[in-house]
């Protein structure tokens, strides 16, 4: 039976979430990608608490970078989430791509976060 795109994404997401979990020492960097925007959260799964979040919908992000290239926006969100995480003392995370393929905007966010100082 062939799965459609949504079912394939859900299947990958369930498979990844079975293996990837965040702790207090090494929280999970979760990425959600919609058609126009990208969201990133650093989550402690044991406490069920979001420690840091950033998205392309934030007013300061929109005024600074405006509308346009979504891949460039992903790079900026990666840098922003890394800066906020490092400010809270979080250096090591576990990367959760949210069922999406590690390609394009998800990859751009991950590489920017690594360059900005996050380890995963």
From Swiss-Prot:
The keyword rRNA-binding applies. It comes from the Bacteria. The keyword RNA-binding applies. GO terms for biological process: translation. Residues 11-20 have a biased composition (Basic residues). InterPro entries: Ribosomal_uL18_bac-type, Ribosomal_uL18_bac/euk. GO terms for cellular component: cytosolic large ribosomal subunit. Gene3D superfamilies: 3.30.420.100. Residues 1-10 have a biased composition (Basic and acidic residues). Keywords: Ribonucleoprotein, Ribosomal protein, RNA-binding, rRNA-binding. Disulfide bonds: none annotated. GO terms for molecular function: 5S rRNA binding; structural constituent of ribosome. Residues 1-26 are annotated as: Disordered. NCBIfam families: L18_bact. Part of the 50S ribosomal subunit; part of the 5S rRNA/L5/L18/L25 subcomplex. Contacts the 5S and 23S rRNAs. Belongs to the universal ribosomal protein uL18 family. PANTHER family: 39S RIBOSOMAL PROTEIN L18, MITOCHONDRIAL, LARGE RIBOSOMAL SUBUNIT PROTEIN UL18M. This is one of the proteins that bind and probably mediate the attachment of the 5S RNA into the large ribosomal subunit, where it forms part of the central protuberance. HAMAP family: Ribosomal_uL18_B (MF_01337_B). This is Large ribosomal subunit protein uL18. It comes from Cyanothece sp. (strain PCC 7425 / ATCC 29141). The gene is rplR.
